[in-house]
Amino acid sequence: MASSASSLHFLSLTPQTLLLPKPTSQTTSLSFFSLPPSSLNLSLSSPSSCFSSRFVRKVTLPDFDQIEDVEDGDEGVEEERNFSPDLKIFVGNLLFSADSAALAELFERAGNVEMVEVIYDKLTGRSRGFGFVTMSSKEEVEAACQQFNGYELDGRALRVNSGPPPEKRENSSFRENSSFRGGSRGGGSFDSSNRVYVGNLAWGVDQDALETLFSEQGKVVDAKVVYDRDSGRSRGFGFVTYSSAEEVNNAIESLDGVDLNGRAIRVSPAEARPPRRQF
């Protein structure tokens, strides 16, 4: 066929009777009924892409208006499939030019990708540097996190985390902040007065790096980097909790001004946290 899609048109027929004469005296009549003008479209398109079985979304913030392309060939699909939150993966530190197709192609190496979302700013239309990938099973989620956390995509090391943000502690003075990788290391209660504030952190520093550095000065009960709940990016500061006040003093004296990933960190008692600087 010359074109990629063809249409067969049915003409409107008015009620009428067609008489067919026969050798006998009897006649046979065939009745035709009125049909409204209509068109039957037969689409001849190119083979479906490798992402034809999933949704690929472009989501804008802050009110999450979205444009949704359903690429499974079924024009009757009106509602998005619901997936378990356990199957959703956060992907941060994306290059602004990275789109959902690039993410889908990458994460398919770890399993079947059900849906991909890249978050865009509604006003500027630019990517906000993070998105979400939904896999088919928990095993694939674990495989993707292990395989792609720290993976370099277009020159940037991805941050890949699974599951919902951890529950916030009631005694926390920073309840508005949510970390995709947080929570108490010790699994028990601790004295918040033995906590130090750590500022001027490089964006790539995570809680593991904090714990490694601060464990040189004592027993680290808890280490946390604070992340922005919308972008998923580090806010450039965090907290470390020790088991005693003596360890807190040692950490402040020894680590304040120490270079960590190219930046001189600021260490002070959490209660006397200095105001944040703009970088």
Swiss-Prot record:
Expressed at high levels in the leaves and seedlings, and lower levels are seen in the stems and roots. Residues 156-187 are annotated as: Disordered. Gene3D superfamilies: 3.30.70.330. GO terms for cellular component: chloroplast thylakoid membrane; ribonucleoprotein complex. Residues 166-193 are annotated as: Linker (Gly-rich). The keyword Chloroplast applies. Residues 87-165, 194-272 form the RRM domain. GO terms for biological process: chloroplast rRNA processing; mRNA processing. Keywords: Chloroplast, mRNA processing, Plastid, Repeat, Ribonucleoprotein, RNA-binding, Transit peptide. PROSITE patterns: RRM. GO terms for molecular function: mRNA binding. It is found in: Plastid, Chloroplast. Could be involved in splicing and/or processing of chloroplast RNA's. This is 30 kDa ribonucleoprotein, chloroplastic. It comes from Nicotiana plumbaginifolia (Leadwort-leaved tobacco). The lineage of its organism: Eukaryota, Viridiplantae, Streptophyta, Embryophyta, Tracheophyta.
